[in-house]
Amino acid sequence: MFDALAERLEQAWTKLRGQDKISESNVQEALKEVRRALLEADVNLGVVKEFIAQVQEKAVGTQVISGIRPDQQFIKVVYDELVQVMGETHVPLAQAAKAPTVILMAGLQGAGKTTATAKLALHLRKEGRSTLLVATDVYRPAAIDQLITLGKQIDVPVFELGSDANPVEIARQGVEKARQEGIDTVIVDTAGRLQIDTEMMEELAQVKEAIAPHEVLLVVDSMIGQEAASLTRSFHERIGITGAILTKLDGDSRGGAALSIRRVSGQPIKFVGLGEKVEALQPFHPERMASRILGMGDVLTLVEKAQEEIDLADVEKMQEKILAAKFDFTDFLKQMRLLKNMGSLAGFIKLIPGLGGKINDEQLRQGERQLKRVEAMINSMTPQERRDPDLLSNSPSRRHRIAKGCGQTEAEIRQIIQQFQQMRTMMQQMSQGGFPGMGGMGMPGFGGGMPGFGGGAPAPQPGFRGYGPPKKQKKGSKKKKGFGL
């Protein structure tokens, strides 16, 4: 997402490089590139015109700070305006003073509404809120079955009355059921249409009137481009939305919908979908999204994703093994699977400042393939070989057997083992506080040190940043999650 937009904006900054100040004349070329970039990203034309006018006014009237180049100052102006357009700050879901909180989901067919409903339920369950899903889509074949299947997958109950019942009555009874059972939140999945029509809007209005929702969330497919603006406007004028969920941002969408929805409706984007898995839903933070658009990464989201997967106790054990030079292939496999659990390699890389626009899709695909090869190699080892990598260094017959087991050459196996040994040694030295100034090393496939990725430097693991070992937890203290820094 936003790759083409980020590349285009990079061209805009070059128009101001070498200038000693921002003026009415020299900013025009940069603004043309920004305008072209936004239009190619499918941002609504009216939003683009307003955006450019605001940037021009602020850029020309801004005093360039001593030591800051004009192109850097211009980037700051564009960043601030992007944040402003997308809503300034994250807007959390409403929560009723008296349970249940009722959330009505709306949107066109194919936008991913039912999946987004389940994703939202899982997000709330992780926050400790009990949730009930209500299936009112009685028109689409298997829509109710789909929601029931997703509900079982995330361990959230689903209320339904079959495909012959009235959607308004299903919604009303579902909310009442939640009230009787003391459930915190009800999420009502409604029927979609291939296009907006009077019948659809009338039914939505009746459901809304019957259940008086605290949130009306419009699910928007980010791949519909400029139509996102008119779609949002139509739903807001007829139903009155309180926010939006933008889906499929991990695909080939240009991302322009993210810049149009708030400005057109005045209502915030509250979540974005970044994959098909039910875990692939993130709260929308305008300042973080602006940072991604400008190729500056998103460290906070990276940290949050890691905190969900990393346990402090595991970090301490791993650090102790590294200090004792006992880091083995079993540990390495755990680290690889941790990376997988955090999402795709492409999504992970693009959250890292400075890397998002530097690594092309082919390199990312190569990195993904190599991760699979290394995992296959480790899976072909015996438990003893995983625990003692030196066995493989000294035994050609073991390497031959592993190569046959994972479909790779003996030379490839030998190279991966050598790189692993180098990585293990350097990780031990780095965890003891050595190797200053080695930032940027260790990215899989890009000159870094994960075995099989074309380099001997170590891949920095969460918690191993050249600091001393973390302090031991006191007995009885609550287990914490995080990097262990």
From Swiss-Prot:
The keyword Secreted does not apply. GTP binds at residues 107-114, 189-193, 247-250. Its main location: cytoplasm. Gene3D superfamilies: P-loop containing nucleotide triphosphate hydrolases, Signal recognition particle SRP54, nucleotide-binding domain, Signal recognition particle, SRP54 subunit, M-domain. InterPro entries: AAA+_ATPase, P-loop_NTPase, Signal_recog_part_SRP54_M_sf, Signal_recog_particl_SRP54_hlx, Signal_recog_particle_SRP54_M, SRP, SRP54, SRP54_GTPase_dom. It is an enzyme of class 3 (hydrolase). One of its GO terms (cellular component) is signal recognition particle. It is found in: Cytoplasm. The keyword Transcription regulation does not apply. SMART domains: AAA, SRP54, SRP54_N. It catalyses: GTP + H2O = GDP + phosphate + H(+). Pfam families: SRP54 (PF00448), SRP54_N (PF02881), SRP_SPB (PF02978). Keywords: Cytoplasm, GTP-binding, Hydrolase, Nucleotide-binding, Ribonucleoprotein, RNA-binding, Signal recognition particle. One of its GO terms (molecular function) is ATP hydrolysis activity. Residues 471-485 have a biased composition (Basic residues). SUPFAM superfamilies: P-loop containing nucleoside triphosphate hydrolases, Signal peptide-binding domain. Its EC number is 3.6.5.4. It comes from the Bacteria. GO terms for biological process: SRP-dependent cotranslational protein targeting to membrane. Belongs to the GTP-binding SRP family. SRP54 subfamily. Composed of three domains: the N-terminal N domain, which is responsible for interactions with the ribosome, the central G domain, which binds GTP, and the C-terminal M domain, which binds the RNA and the signal sequence of the RNC. Part of the signal recognition particle protein translocation system, which is composed of SRP and FtsY. Involved in targeting and insertion of nascent membrane proteins into the cytoplasmic membrane. Binds to the hydrophobic signal sequence of the ribosome-nascent chain (RNC) as it emerges from the ribosomes. The SRP-RNC complex is then targeted to the cytoplasmic membrane where it interacts with the SRP receptor FtsY. This is Signal recognition particle protein.
